[in-house]
Amino acid sequence: MATQTVGRIYSQHGDAVRTVPLQLPDALKTPPADAAPAAAASPPQLTYRNGPLIAAVEVFTLFWGPEWQSSQAALATQINGFFDFILTSPLIDQLAEYSAGSHAIGHGKRTGTTTIVTPALKHSVSDTAIQHMLQTEISTNAALPKPSPNTLYFIYMPPGVKVVQGGSASCTGFCGYHNDISGQIFYAVMPYPGCSGCTGGLALLDALTSTSSHELCESITDPIPGQGWYDDANGEIGDICAWKTKKVGTYTVQLEWSNKQNKCV
């Protein structure tokens, strides 16, 4: 289907550095029998572009929509529990190899959570509107921490809301992304995984923790997309290993690229 053939979207420096791509069916990954042999690709290698890194990440979760106080309340609690565990787990420990200069990557913490019910969401929302909401909430809602070099806002969308970003949309082009606002505010957006390409055969919570871990690790190592650790051909630390998962504790997370081990770990 068309919604399963789109892997990445691109803009001026490549939105692939921001997004979790859709999972492609195996049949679409296999070249035709009569296809010419592909040239050997050079192995991935992330290089540091001298931009900021998030050394001790402070995650604040925002759940947008009244559903998160009713039908999705239990899921919101589970997502917060995921961050409480994962931010001091071996998943974060393995990112230490990407420390650079004064940025020594270590454990983080979740600093809080809130549910946003206004403005009310319609059937789609743009990244511009998400940025506006976030900036407004930072300015007017005392529940939100002020942005710092370590602050990372994770924004979760309710079922039935399409997110539009970079000329593409959730469930037709991507499953999540991270971005920055003027290099000062770091955030990640998690659309509700309402399609097979964004669940990858996983249970709902597992799909969300997998994509959340993808964007978490990319935000830490490349908070301003393309200015931290990046590979021109393959994107960010999570892009190289998209939809390869493992368990950390009881949670499903995505494998991440290791320069030292030259593989997804």
Q: Residues of each region from the PLM?
A:
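Surface-exposed patches in mature extracellular/periplasmic domains of secreted proteins
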Residues: 90-99, 143-152, 228, 232
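Active-site-proximal segments of metallohydrolase catalytic domains
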Residues: 107-180
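Loop/turn elements at helix/coil->beta-strand transitions in domains of secreted/extracellular proteins
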Residues: 55-59, 148-153, 183-186
